[in-house]
């Protein structure tokens, strides 16, 4: 596939989305209930696939390293304001980066206490942290336990798989240190803090070996992430013609191992969500389905942004021009980039709408739909892989249900 180089110009969609017209026709935004706080804008790893530091958007360079107490307090106030306005009684905050643990224990404690104090006792607030694992010492895990913060760790499986990408600035792999940290997190008194493992797929890694390497830590959940890319800059190994579907093959191997186990060893969220969609449920997931986006990102300077993964499209793709000092989260909900991702089928391309699987795949992860000519009004660059994977899983589930005299729900693709 040959396409022109990326530019800085805003794409036609969703910039041209007419939010005012949609509101006049009766659409009302779905309130947010999840907030990603970029508490530190730098990292102590230099992963070669990182969407923050290795993407077209380099705005992180202008961000302050940490969120000041003033910005933190204003962010907490804005979150509380939004939850109160919309009567939301359960919400989540993810401390993110960069590497969030670079802020240190004092700032971490202040951040958590500020957030809890702002939302008050009337809101059940779930606090979590996504880390590369390098700073998960016993003492820090004790602190996270005291603060009630669950932990997700990024790791790509075995040593060779992990260290191929997840290295320090000096080129040294991080696998041994992350494994030691996971040993502390996954056992004993720290086990209740364990949230999930996050693994980016690399086609060079054996899928079953990768999955089983992750299973050695008995994670409550595993998130397999498709490498970020789009029609302009396709991910590694994607076949532009759609004749080969290597990512479907990779995930199918994981599915067979996971689905065929005697007992459910862990939740593989992508596959659990796919099964739920095929059975007629509506799980909340960014990767599949049509559920409205209900989260926002706050940078260290207080800027309100869209999903960080949009940075892989072009410089400025995630920016909104809004910030917590001057704008509410309600204002963010009316930004075309956020609003369009709450419109379900109305925001899908004509190609997607003509496909019988569109309610299951939802067009694919939003960031992977980008093309310079049409913006995000396209199927995912993973369209062929998603189609193949959904078809295989559907046939397997239909056969199993049929063996027990229970067909797939009529609404399933």
Describe these PLM feature segments.
Residues 56-57, 361, 392:
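Short, non-ligating residues that shape and space the ligands of small metal-coordination modules
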